[in-house]
Amino acid sequence: LKINPYEGVIKVFGKDLKKIKKKELYRTMGIVFQNPANQFITQNVLDEVKQSIRLWNNKLSDEEVNNEALKRLDEYGLLRYKRYSPYMLSQGQQRRLAVLSVLAGEQKILLLDEPTYGQDYRSTCAIMSLLEDKIKTKGLSVILITHDEELAKSYADKRYVVRGNGVYEA
């Protein structure tokens, strides 16, 4: 992650970004890649979610982790695919799995690159509703990258447009 302001200071949780150790920053940040298949690390969908839960909640028993993973898969409409390889899912299902896996953690900042691309209206609303809930209940900051201007208008507190070599407030 390399962000250097032309002037001024970038602060994350009140600290100058240049003075934050990378490891500390990465522990507070969750990322969903534009191509979600690039972030999967396990052999099946259930294990993918369990891995994320365990990473952030290592005090839970195996049974608790399994139950929580099954509950979350059900919420996202992915329960019937629990034994599938993540790579066997459709692009939209992979995207939901990636978002689900990231939300399993205790991050304070989420960077989501096109999390609703390829989703139908219902799935888009479900993902965005879940994000809104996490923002309200956990105080998350979300940086959402999208080409969907209507989505950005509907959900964002602040919007910026990247054009040419500049970043402009929308």
Give the positions of each predicted feature.
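Conserved ABC transporter NBD signature motif
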Residues: 5-16, 25
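Conserved ABC ATPase "signature" region
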Residues: 62-81
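Conserved ABC ATPase signature
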Residues: 85-89, 93
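ABC ATPase C-loop
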Residues: 102-103
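Catalytic Walker B motif of ABC-type/P-loop ATPase nucleotide-binding domains
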Residues: 110-113
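Short loop immediately C-terminal to the Walker-B catalytic DE motif
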Residues: 116-117
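ABC-family nucleotide-binding domains
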Residues: 120
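H-loop/switch region of ABC-family ATPase nucleotide-binding domains
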Residues: 146-147
